[in-house]
Every structure is written in structure tokens, then in C-alpha cells.
């Protein structure tokens, strides 16, 4: 057991270093950019988004970057989304509302909605964004300036995650921990290794010519995790993508409460693991060994496990402070967070892997 405890301690020491390197080397959107430049087509799929769609639309219409068109694909919403979009389109001609059609065989709903939006778009740059996002007024201009400066095919913008309530504060930091602690994201910004491709519904901005060259969303028509798939497709073609911190400009509350988090990630976590039962099992075992077992052994007074818990805590405090998350949850919630995501992994594997049926936003589809 001491050998295992030593391995876990070394692994967390490396994770601590990796977190520091990522925080130092993942660039922020620094350039404010001008008000003019190439036409940017913002494409938003909206399915039953009455809760925040108006905030999102108004944030994009308030951008200081003037050469912008906003395309929202109303993906057959059954709530007030359509009425909210009609009202805002009547007030500003830059908002184009498309009424989404039923997906053809072989297509999932979101990639089909994005594909429809891309066919209508006229922009040299395409910005794919989810429907529950707030962008500060200079965000689009800053993203365009960074892409032009660095000559990349695609940029992914990382947000600030708004959290309220117990389970959101416990579970949602896993997304940031994955990017900043588990992955060498800084290395992905300097290579075209496909497996380091990171995409996000909070902002994938891509040059039209590169989007078309990789086949657009038609090449991702059955992708459950289409945003990550887009980044990896770009990288597989030999093109560069970069990740930028935009947590001072972009914010969203992704899910409201633990049940929404559970349901939301049930639909796509197994897909994110490559639909591999082996990888799902490995992630569960690793989650216990590297993230929960040290806390259990620390209770017995095992010295290296106590040191591991200290390293985990310092790593979380450092990351949470940088991202402006609540520090009290950094101190104690790590094993509970990992246990929660273990449950999500099991549920996602069962529902989408074994049963192969997903219900989301009032729609059922084959996983």
C-alpha cells in the first residue's frame, strides 16, 4: 500500500506542476481588437432555451465588433424560445432566426442545427456558441484579433462558470480541473496532436475555409460531443487550434442543480470516453485510487496520503483562486466531486452505452 500511496503522491505532484504551467501559459484574450474586420457569423442552436436566450442574443447584438451577423436556429422549441427570438429579431435586423427542420436520418439534433446555421452564414469567420452564454461587449473583437495575430484555424474560448447551490459548487469545477490540472493544455496550444483538441460550446471560432475543408458539421453529424469533435477534426487535418482563457469576458450557468448536471452529462460523458467500456472502467478505478483513496488512507494517519491530500488541496485552492470559484469548496469537496462524476460515468455508460437511448430537452434519440 505504501508503494501505491507513493505513486499517487508523485502523480499529484506532477498535476500540481501541470496546473501551474497551464495557468501561466494558456493565454487570455488580451487584444481588444477594433470595431471592424472580417465578417463574423455567430451561430447559435436553441432548443427550449427560454431561460437565457434573450440575455445571450442581446449580449451579441451589443458587441463593439460591428461586422457581425447573428444566426439563431430555433431547433423546434416547445417553450417560449421562438417568441423571444421573434421579438428581438423585429427590433434588430442583424438577428436572423431560422426555424430548424427535423434532422435527416443519421444526424443528431445539435449538429444538424449548426449545419443549417452554417449554410445561411456569410461570414469569413464562424463562431459556434451555445444559447445560454453571456459575452462582454469586446469579446468577439478580442477573439478575432487573437486569431489574426496567431494565425490559427480555430480558437476555443474558456468561460467563467456561474454556480449556485451545493451540487453546482461541488460538481462543476471538474470541467476546469480537467483542462487545467489533468491535461497538458498548454502543449496543445503548441502542437497539432489531435487528442489535445479542446472545443467548447462556450465559443469555437473557426475560419470558414478551414471549416469547409474538414467537412463542416456534416463530418460530425452523429457526434454527441460535437464541439470537441470539431477541434479534433481540425487538428487531424494538420491545422492549428488554440485555447484561450476568457473567464473575465464570458460567463454562463451551464446547469441549475445537481439533477440537471447528472442528466446533462449522462447524454455525452460515455461518448467523450470514446464509447469505450474499458476506458470508462479505467476512469472509475483511477478516480477511486487517485482521488478518493488518499482521503481514506489519510484518516488512518498514512503519511504519504496526508501529503497527497495537502497537494490536492493546494492545487485546488490555487486553481479556484485564479478562476474566482468559491474557495471553501476547494478545501474539502474533492472526493465528493469525484464520487459524483463516478456516478455520472456509470449512468452515462448504462444509458447511452448499454440501452443506447437518451432523453434530453423533450427529445429522445439513439445514442
Task: List each language-model region with its residue ranges.
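Acidic donor-binding/catalytic loop of UDP-sugar-dependent glycosyltransferases
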Residues: 80, 129-146
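Membrane-embedded multi-pass helical conduit in multi-pass membrane proteins
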Residues: 34, 279-355
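Short, well-formed alpha-helical segments that are part of the catalytic scaffolds
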Residues: 21-29, 49-62
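Acidic donor-binding segment of Leloir-type glycosyltransferases
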Residues: 57-104
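Cell-envelope/extracellular polymer assembly enzymes that use nucleotide-activated donors
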Residues: 38-41, 69
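Long helical/loop segments within the catalytic core of UDP-sugar-dependent glycosyltransferases
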Residues: 17-22, 96-119, 142, 146-213, ...
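N-terminal membrane-anchoring/stem segments of glycan-assembly enzymes
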Residues: 1-36, 173, 185
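Catalytic donor/gating beta->alpha subdomain of glycosyltransferases that bind UDP-sugars
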Residues: 147, 154-181, 209-212, 217-279, ...
Amino acid at each position: 500500500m505504501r508503494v501505491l500511496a507513493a505513486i499517487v503522491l508523485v502523480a499529484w505532484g506532477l498535476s500540481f506542476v501541470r496546473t501551474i504551467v497551464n495557468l501561466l501559459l494558456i493565454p487570455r484574450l488580451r487584444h481588444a481588437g477594433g470595431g471592424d474586420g472580417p465578417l463574423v457569423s455567430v451561430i447559435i442552436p436553441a432548443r427550449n432555451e427560454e431561460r437565457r436566450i434573450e440575455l445571450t442574443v442581446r449580449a451579441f447584438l451589443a458587441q463593439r465588433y460591428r461586422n457581425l451577423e447573428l444566426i439563431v436556429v430555433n431547433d423546434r422549441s416547445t417553450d417560449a424560445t421562438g417568441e423571444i427570438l421573434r421579438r428581438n429579431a423585429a427590433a434588430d435586423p442583424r438577428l436572423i432566426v431560422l426555424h430548424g427542420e427535423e434532422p435527416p436520418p443519421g444526424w443528431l439534433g445539435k449538429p444538424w442545427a449548426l449545419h443549417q446555421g452554417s449554410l445561411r452564414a456569410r461570414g469569413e469567420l464562424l463562431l459556434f456558441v451555445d444559447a445560454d452564454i453571456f459575452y462582454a461587449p469586446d469579446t468577439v473583437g478580442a477573439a478575432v484579433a487573437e486569431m489574426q495575430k496567431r494565425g490559427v484555424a480555430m480558437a476555443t474560448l474558456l468561460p467563467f462558470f456561474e454556480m449556485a447551490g451545493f451540487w453546482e459548487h461541488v460538481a462543476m469545477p471538474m470541467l476546469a480541473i480537467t483542462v487545467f490540472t489533468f491535461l497538458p493544455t498548454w502543449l496543445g496550444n503548441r502542437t497539432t496532436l489531435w487528442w489535445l483538441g479542446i472545443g467548447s460550446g462556450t465559443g469555437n471560432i473557426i475560419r470558414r475555409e478551414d471549416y469547409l475543408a474538414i467537412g463542416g458539421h456534416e463530418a460530425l453529424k452523429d457526434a454527441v460531443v460535437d464541439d470537441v469533435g470539431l477541434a479534433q477534426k481540425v487538428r487531424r487535418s494538420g491545422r492549428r487550434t488554440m485555447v484561450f482563457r476568457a473567464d473575465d469576458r464570458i460567463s454562463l450557468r451551464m446547469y441549475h442543480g445537481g439533477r440537471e448536471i447528472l442528466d446533462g452529462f449522462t447524454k455525452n460523458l460515455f461518448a467523450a470516453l470514446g464509447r469505450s467500456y474499458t476506458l470508462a472502467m479505467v476512469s472509475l478505478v483511477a478516480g477511486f485510487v487517485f482521488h478518493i483513496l488518499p482521503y481514506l488512507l489519510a484518516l488512518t494517519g498514512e503519511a504519504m496520503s496526508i501529503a497527497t491530500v495537502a497537494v490536492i488541496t493546494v492545487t485546488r485552492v490555487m486553481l479556484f483562486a485564479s478562476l474566482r470559484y468559491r474557495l471553501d469548496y476547494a478545501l474539502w469537496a474533492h472526493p465528493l466531486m469525484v464520487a459524483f462524476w463516478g456516478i455520472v460515468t456509470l449512468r452515462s455508460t448504462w444509458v447511452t452505452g448499454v440501452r443506447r437511448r437518451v432523453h434530453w430537452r423533450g427529445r429522445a434519440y439513439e445514442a
